[in-house]
Structures are given as structure tokens and as C-alpha cells.
Amino acid sequence: MKPIKRAFLDTEDGQILYRIGGEGEPLLLLHMAPRSSDEFRELMPILAQNRCVIAMDLMGLGDSDKPPREYSVADYAKTVIALWDELGIQKSSILGNLTGGYIAGEVAAAYPERVDKLILCNVVGFDAQEQEIILNRYTEGFKIEEDGSHLMARWLARVNDVGKEELNHRCVVDDLKCFGSPIYPAMAAASYFLDAQARFSLLKCPTLILSGEKALDILEKAGLAKAENQFWLSKAIPHSQKVELPGGTLWMLNQMPEEVAKIVVDFLRI
């Protein structure tokens, strides 16, 4: 297996970092906000045993540049196509986690000839009030406090749910990289939700809806999502398959990579 390497894609709006490794049919991984391609650190080596696996940092997050304007989900979808064109990939499967799932679905809707199979992981739905909370929170972004209290605030934000200090540290590092600017991918996903219900109904490719049994827990506690708003995806894509991973959380890609990889590999083999 080829080692997983890091590289940059040059675009008119700045550079996009991506990780790539393995050989075979391509699989693109798109992370949630405000994380980065580090979200797939545990998963990539497993999937790269049989595939060419690519994970990109969404513009404005991780080690990708900040975009010069507010990006929409459609803009993020165009960056996916730009990366595929750069790598000579005509058709690929995609796994998108939460924010990345919205972008993955838009790629499949806007460029159906470029998508083989689609995996939508923990792609939650929102009502109008939740959308407003998300937009307000991420438009402001994370603020730097003079006394450094923002550092402890980010550490405490998810430590009880992530479970491992090392993983929480990685999440906080991703948080710190997007301080001082709006978190555009999260804003784009929240703004896109009503459109997503119509856009995702256009999908024809084989689609897996993968969710963690406990993925909603922290979102419900934060007032960002409710269980009763989570049926839209199956309705929008009636031909989709659905798998719920027992014990899976919002960070199950890091916490349970072997279990997630088995589900992904089994679906892609069909």
C-alpha cells in the first residue's frame, strides 16, 4: 500500500490541502465542520488497503486557505470537481460526514455522471430555529479572549463526549485553526438544508445512510438538532439503504474505524 501523503490543490480562491493514499477505485472523504481531513486519520489506512482514498480540508478549515468570500454548498461541490480533475479522476464514490455529507449529496445531484456510490454519514436535519442558532453561532466564529479562556472553552466543548484526551486535543487544534473568521462550511450546510431536501431527491446513485446510535446526543444537548427532524433523508432518497452503528457517536469515524470501515467496504462491494 502506498503511504498516505499530503499535498495541495491550487485554486483561484486559495490552496486546498488533501491527503491521498492507496491504489484502486477512488473514494473521497469529506469531513464535518469544524474538523479537517484529520477526521479520517484512523479510517484512511484501513480503506486504502483496497482503494485510492482521498480526504480534503474544506476551504476555511484545517490547513486549507480561508476563502475570500462566503462559500455555498455548491461552491464546495465545485472544489471537489476541481480536485478530481487535478487527479485525473473521472468518477468516484464519496463518503461525507455531517457537513461533508451535504456537500457530497450536492456533488451527486449536480454532477451525477461523476459519482459512483454515496455514503451519507450522520447527515442530520434541522428545523428553522435550529438553523438560525447554527448560522448565528458559526457566523460569529470562535473568538479569541484576552485571558486565554477560549482555549479551555474549546477543550470543554466536547471532552465528555469524545472520550479520549488525544482525540479531543485533535478536535481543539482544528477549532483553533478557524479562529478569527466565520466557519463557512457549517454556515453553508445550515443555509442549504431546505434546498437539500429537493436536491437529494434527484439522487440516482446507490446511497447508504450511515448513522451512529448516539450521534445526536451532543447536538440535542446543544439545541442544534432533534430526533424528530431526522427522517427527511430516507424520504428524500427512498432507494437508499440505512445502517445504524450501535454505540456510534458523532466521532465514530475516529472511535470505531474498524466497524465503520467494514460497513463502508461491504456497501462499496455491492
Language model features with spans:
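Active-site loop/oxyanion-hole signature of alpha/beta-hydrolase fold enzymes
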Residues: 41-42, 54-99, 253-254, 262
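Flexible "cap/lid" loop of the alpha/beta hydrolase fold
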Residues: 105-110, 116-147
